[in-house]
């Protein structure tokens, strides 16, 4: 749940107090660590059972997590990501609007922006997404429909992503207008693997 939305995770942002919450990935900035946190009545159950875990007692990860949390607080990391994400959403939608591409839109919270593509002219979302992704890669951008923006991305990186999206949208729109999408695609069409 956390640190994309707030230091206390999504539950803090949404005003929910969960019985149990899990933190992983970002908590130690790449070091192997995950955390289970929860209400005292549930966490006390660990006193009565034997439990073990792969990285139990691995102190460098614990030190990394403490430093990570310190940096997130001190440098305003969460707000920085939020601002960059909001800029991506605004820029993506502005690009789509300027090209009259009404079948692509960005949405969501700035801390976790997403974009979606509607079916058009008998082509599926995955077919259109394939060409869009291909053109983004040609412009040095590798992302799926959720461009996970992080603290190390600069404002220039976000502008470059928006520019690449706009150029890719123009190519997709040309292919769709010509009803010739598959002639623009170099590889296989993206397949949905998780349903």
Q: What kind of region is each of these model predictions?
A:
Residues 1-195:
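Conserved N-terminal phosphate-binding loop of PLP-dependent enzymes in the Aspartate aminotransferase
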